[in-house]
């Protein structure tokens, strides 16, 4: 049975303080328990756009001016095009997997959660190491990139790319150096960092970081076409649902102070948004086209290459 989206109590970390989650209701591996849908879930904060992002009608009403970053320490990451996911553990050691506002059925494959099959298998394979690291203290958020959305990747270092960690004890998001240090001993890849330092004086200097995606090879278009044809899918339709640009989706910008991430913003290419608007369907309604991993990547290995 697919997880019941919206049935769990959602704690939006951007809108309210985090409360201690009553995870003890779940038994070990009992991911089909009805209690699963009654647990409070720590939903990743909504991220505002920087002014100039998207550039669709009405988009600038809630956008933040670049001046808000003036003189502040920022970390700029490539914004990846995947599914927001998270991994944590309950007080009794229960493995908890989530996708945005709902929990996943960790031991059930297929159905509406089919794009997360490999995520569930990967989490189970590394459950011991992740439990020893995260325990019930940390919630690890990441981008799950198995299924193509609008960008196709053919050279990813992993399908799960971590981008934030919430500390339930300190009630804050760790900054980038702490996250990387915490994850140094486990086979978890983090999203690529493009810049860290005081924000550039001009927005155009920030936007100069928007370059070809690090998750693609020079042959990604040919690889994509080969895969679509192997799956016997409609190639012209597949291209209409795919961004042809060589560039990444956009930039993700974090403001980090005193060991924590205190603000976050995003900048998304307007032509990327246009592809979504003109595709005629949502990615969840299409056949899955799996993004490719870099040659030699084994997501189940105990040691992996973390670089991009």
Write out the residue ranges for each language-model feature.
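Core nucleotide-handling region used for phosphoryl-transfer chemistry
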Residues: 30-308
